[in-house]
Amino acid sequence: MAGSALEALLVGIGAIPGAWLRLKAVNHFEPMVPKKHWGTFAVNVIACFGLGLVLALYQSCSAKTGLALLIGVGFFGSLSTFSTFAVELLNELRAGRPFVSLVLALASIAAGLCAAGVGYGLGAYG
């Protein structure tokens, strides 16, 4: 199997459980706090942590390229959902709640950066 076909297969295999987990997480939070965006927020922060960890392990050469594609790009890439995040921000703006949109955007970016940093730190130094 050619390298690019194998890489695509690894990403696809990793994406299946990541997308499934995202669906489960978002559906889990929705009945408890409707329209509060906690499901999207949670999966994006978890994905940032995981991708930071995988990146650090990959850069230290303790993770192989195939494993990084499977877990980093496939699983954590499909777990995170920037498009849903953007639509949720847009919906808050359209509903006349710019402050909610701003707080959600800033909190998501700050939490995502912190989570990626912690994941990277654990992978690089832990």
Curated annotation (Swiss-Prot):
Inhibition and activation profile: Na(+) is not transported, but it plays an essential structural role and its presence is essential for fluoride channel function.
Domain of life of the native organism: Bacteria
Catalytic activity annotation: fluoride(in) = fluoride(out)
UniProt keyword list: Cell inner membrane, Cell membrane, Ion channel, Ion transport, Membrane, Metal-binding, Sodium, Transmembrane, Transmembrane helix, Transport
UniProt-recorded name of the protein: Fluoride-specific ion channel FluC 1
InterPro entries, per the entry: FluC (IPR003691)
Disulfide pairings: none
Transmembrane segments: 1-21, 38-58, 67-87, 99-119
GO cellular component, one term: plasma membrane
Functional description taken from the UniProt entry: Fluoride-specific ion channel. Important for reducing fluoride concentration in the cell, thus reducing its toxicity.
Source organism of the structure: Synechococcus sp. (strain CC9902)
